[in-house]
Amino acid sequence: MKKLILDRGVKIYAHLEENGNHYVIPPVAQPKAFAGNVFLWALDEEEDTCSLFQTTGGYRVRHGRAGIEILFDADYSTAVQEGVPSCDFLGNAFCVRVDGSDHLERAMANFYWKSLLNQCAERSFLRNKKWLREGYVLSTLETTFYGGTYPAVDHEFHIRGRLAMGDAFDLQLVRRMLELQLRLMRTDWRRQFRIPCSLQPNGRREYRVYRKSQDKKVKAVMFLLTGVMELVEELYQYYCLTKDIGFVTKHLGALERGLCFAERFLDQNGRLWGDVYYEDQVMKDGANAQAQAFAVHSFRLMARLETIAGVNEKANHYAKLANRMQHNYIQPVPGGYWSEQDSHYVDWIDRQGVVHDHIHLLSNALSVTFGLNDPARNDAVNAVIEQYDDVFQKFPSFVAAKIEDYTESEIGVGGPYDLCAAGRYWCHDAKYRREKADAALLKRQLERVAQQAGADNFDMGERYDMNYIYYNTGEDSRRNWHGSPSYYEYPNVFLDVLVHDFLGIRPDEEADLLIAPCCTIGTEVSMESFGVAYQLSEQGISIQNISNMPKKVRVDLSKIFTGWEERYGASNSIYTLSPAQSLQFEGLFLRTEAQSERKSSLL
């Protein structure tokens, strides 16, 4: 037995392996005494160091007045490094340099260790609820009032952040989160395979959550279809990263039944009456444009999942539904969502036929990202977003351009809660910017959030109103955020935008990874969890396999080099790299440089 005593202020991140699954016992809601095995991390913020203790056996941790006592069953080794470690929980290192600066890497590390790991409640906050705890993650670390887990809306971004890390621990957590949602669907007491808005620590589920408007004249149901639409993409992305076809086929039937429930809200014209999708204090009582855009995307991905599983008849069914909804979306109001007069998509159309339009960011941006428009319509949408981008980008990213025009019938009793910037809007705004190859703006967004996070000690709030229209008087004006403190959203979305959009390391249906950067010249990245590294310079790009096994990568450099698709195409860009092998593209036409000869080589 080996004893170690640490100061009381040190934060312990303990590891527990059970039945081949990795779990973290994080500092938040950590029990006074518990057991772990194999390794543990000790973060000393006062000394600005982090220690990794590794052992061949188990250990016990006890918090006492004199300090933190750790009893190891066997010998242990110690490795100490400065600051918050630039690695995931299992020790896979990552390195991000942009123009020689590690600013974004430091933000990534701090978000991961101070927020994402603390959100894992399976063996901490929910440790005694064995029937409930698997896949349970917290949306706020202030659990006194909001200790639930939120499958509708929140799990989407929890999963995006963890897929961006790509390590075995985070992927296992994603799997357990998916299994939790599927289990809730199968045990829906109405047998409608619904995903609840929330699951509380006592096991209570919230399905139909209604909000009333400030003037008490309107009410709307929250997140009616959000959970199941999100689950389709979550399962698809999980498959693309793991290639676990067995997991897909096992759960595809439950997902089909969940989508059957969603289809009930589709009318004969292909319009989805989806009510509120993301904004739970905006009274979208009817046909919600962004909900329908997400539904088109999800039904397309469901068609892909059915094709992967070899069920072509059902794949055709979902593809046809997606096409119907797309056709409806692009029609002029009142039949569709396009305003011929203003040349943009409206926000929602209520059940009385009233059109609500405040130049909603996602109602327009999603139409470009998801390919709903023809080129002329894309130009019109791009023009209106550019016209109001000074509002959208006050902080990444504001929900709408005209938030001051929302009425008391449109705003919920909780106040103008969602009429500001939020991570969920930024997530999809970033994908729109990626589609437009706007690497410079993606960089500015990441830097802006990292700057604010640093000012907040990486303990970010739920919404950032920036004292713009609302919350700018009295006590509310003393801070630029409101809602829940220590919130999950911006940390997870930051990782998603940095890794998936800016750096362009993403899951791929056929290859192990897609390398499709939308970054600026002078970007270098290395991620051991994915086994890849690349360097982008004015001379070109070099991509290397840094793992110990062959890796198949699809390469798409169309967002940083012009003429890429004409030269290489979408189907001829998959390369198999042996360990330590590099793939180089030199002399390419950078979007900021003059045209030059193109060539590629494997080294």
Give the role of each language-model region.
Residues 238, 262, 305, 325-332:
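Short alpha-helical functional segments enriched in proximate histidine and acidic residues
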Residues 4-12, 18, 428-603:
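Non-catalytic C-terminal accessory modules of carbohydrate-active enzymes
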Residues 121-147, 185-216, 264-283, 330-352, ...:
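Glycine- and aromatic-rich loop/turn segments at beta-sheet edges
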Residues 208-217, 284, 413-416, 538-553:
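Long, charge-rich low-complexity segments
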Residues 151-157, 161-182, 249, 253-260, ...:
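Active-site core of glycosidic bond-cleaving carbohydrate-active enzymes
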Residues 90-248, 358-372, 409-434, 443:
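Substrate-binding groove/exosite segments of carbohydrate-active enzymes
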Residues 111-112, 319-338:
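Gly/Pro-rich turn-and-neighbor structural signature
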Residues 4-13, 17-149, 237-240, 245-247, ...:
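Acidic/polar, glycine-enriched structural segments that form the non-catalytic walls/loops
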